[in-house]
Amino acid sequence: MAKGKFERTKPHVNVGTIGHVDHGKTTLTAAITTILSKKFGGEAKAYDQIDAAPEEKARGITINTAHVEYETANRHYAHVDCPGHADYVKNMITGAAQMDGAILVCSAADGPMPQTREHILLARQVGVPYIIVFLNKCDMVDDEELLELVEMEVRELLSKYDFPGDDVPIIKGSALKALEGDQSDIGEPAIFRLAEALDSYIPTPERAIDRPFLLPIEDVFSISGRGTVVTGRVERGIVKVGEEVEIVGIKATVKTTCTGVEMFRKLLDQGQAGDNVGVLLRGTKREDVERGQVLCKPGSIKPHTHFTGEVYVLSKEEGGRHTPFFNNYRPQFYFRTTDVTGSIELPEGTEMVMPGDNVSITVKLMAPIAMEEGLRFAIREGGRTVGAGVVAKIIE
C-alpha cells in the first residue's frame, strides 16, 4: 500500500553524477540525500545502499543504476548514480536515465582523468544540456593555487567539448566531510551550494505535452466510409481534431488533416502525450502511410539519412555479436517502430569495433527517418539487438 499520495508541488528535474572512478560520485550522492533530507525532507541514503545498485534492463542491455530522489528549496530531483564506467556508457547512450543536467564529480587531489574527459564527451554526444561541477576531496589539497589550477583544467576540458567552461558553476567541497556533518565551508555548506546551483543553473525542462506534436506510427487501418486511421502512442504534444498534420519519414513528406481522434473506442476532440490513440486522416490512402513514419505538427521535424551517432555495442554475454565489425558494416537501424538498413563508417584510425565497446560512427540510411539530435535507436541483425545508439549530429 502506498504511504500517502505523491505530492507533485515542485517541478521535477532529472540529474545524475558523472566522472572518473573513485573521484567520489557515490559518496556525493549519499551526502546530497543525507544533508538535503534534514532540511527539506525526503530519505537519506547511505553509501552502501547506493553502491549496491540493482540491475536493470534497458533495450535488452543490462545496466546497474542506483536511483535516489531529493528535494531542494524549489524542486524535486530524481538522481542516477552508476557503479561502473561501463554502466555510465550504456546508461547515457540508451537514454535509460535521461538527464536534464549532470553533476560532474572531479577530485581536486587528482584533477581531470581519462573518464572525466570521456564522460564530458559522452554528455556532449548524447545531448546532456547542462553540467555543474563538484570539485571533491578539497580537504586533501592545502594549496589554494593547486585548487585554482584544477578548476582551470576542468573549465578548459568543458570548453573543449562545447560546454560553456567559463560559466559552468564549480562547487568546491568534500563529500566525505559533508557526510560526517562537518560545518566548515567544504562540508555541509558545500552541499547546499550545490543544491542552489542545481536550482538556478539547470532550467526547468519543457514538459512533453508542451512540445510540438509527434506520434510514431505503429499501425495503419482502412475504415470503409471513413478513411485511413493510424495508431500509436503520442510521444509529445497535442493533436486536435481539425488540425493539419504531416506524415514524415521513409517517403516524401505529405500534409493531411486529422479528422478524428479515438481512444479505447471513444471519440475524443484531442490526443495528448502519453495517449494510445487512433488518428483518422482526411483523404489519405491506406498505401500512402506505413509503420515507421511519424505523424507530427507541420514543419516540426525533418527526414534525414546521414548522421553521426554514439553507439554501445552489446557484449557476447548481453546477447550481442561474438565477433567485431568493420568499416561499411551494414546492419538494420531500428528507429521508433521500424528497421531501416544503413551503412556504418568508423572514425579514422579505428580498424574495428569489439563487442562491449562504445564508438562514434557515421551512418547513411537507405531511407529517410524523421530525426532530431538525441533520438535513440537500436542496431539489429536479423531482428536481434546488437547495439544501442543515439543521434549526435545530423549531417543531411
UniProtKB/Swiss-Prot annotation:
Binding site for GTP: 19-26, 81-85, 136-139
CDD domains: EF_Tu, EFTU_II, EFTU_III
Localization per record: Cytoplasm
Catalysis: reaction(s): GTP + H2O = GDP + phosphate + H(+)
InterPro entries linked to this entry: EF-Tu_GTP-bd, EF-Tu_GTPase, EFTu-like_2, EFTU_2, G_TR_CS, P-loop_NTPase, Small_GTP-bd, T_Tr_GTP-bd_dom
Stretches the record annotates as G2: 60-64
Region (G3): 81-84
Entries under SUPFAM superfamilies matching the protein: EF-Tu/eEF-1alpha/eIF2-gamma C-terminal domain, P-loop containing nucleoside triphosphate hydrolases, Translation proteins
Region (G4): 136-139
Residues annotated to bind Mg(2+): T26
EC nos: 3.6.5.3
PROSITE patterns reported in the protein's UniProt record: G_TR_1, G_TR_2
Single GO term (MF): translation elongation factor activity
Start and end residues of each tr-type G domain: 10-206
Residue ranges, annotated region (G1): 19-26
Residue segments, region G5: 174-176
CC terms in the record's Gene Ontology section: cytosol
Domain of life: Bacteria
UniProt enzyme class: hydrolase
Subunit: Monomer.
Xref: HAMAP family: EF_Tu_B
Protein family according to the UniProt entry: Belongs to the TRAFAC class translation factor GTPase superfamily. Classic translation factor GTPase family. EF-Tu/EF-1A subfamily.
Chain's role: GTP hydrolase that promotes the GTP-dependent binding of aminoacyl-tRNA to the A-site of ribosomes during protein biosynthesis.
Protein name as catalogued: Elongation factor Tu
Organism expressing this protein natively: Aromatoleum aromaticum (strain DSM 19018 / LMG 30748 / EbN1) (Azoarcus sp. (strain EbN1))
Chain's gene name: tuf1
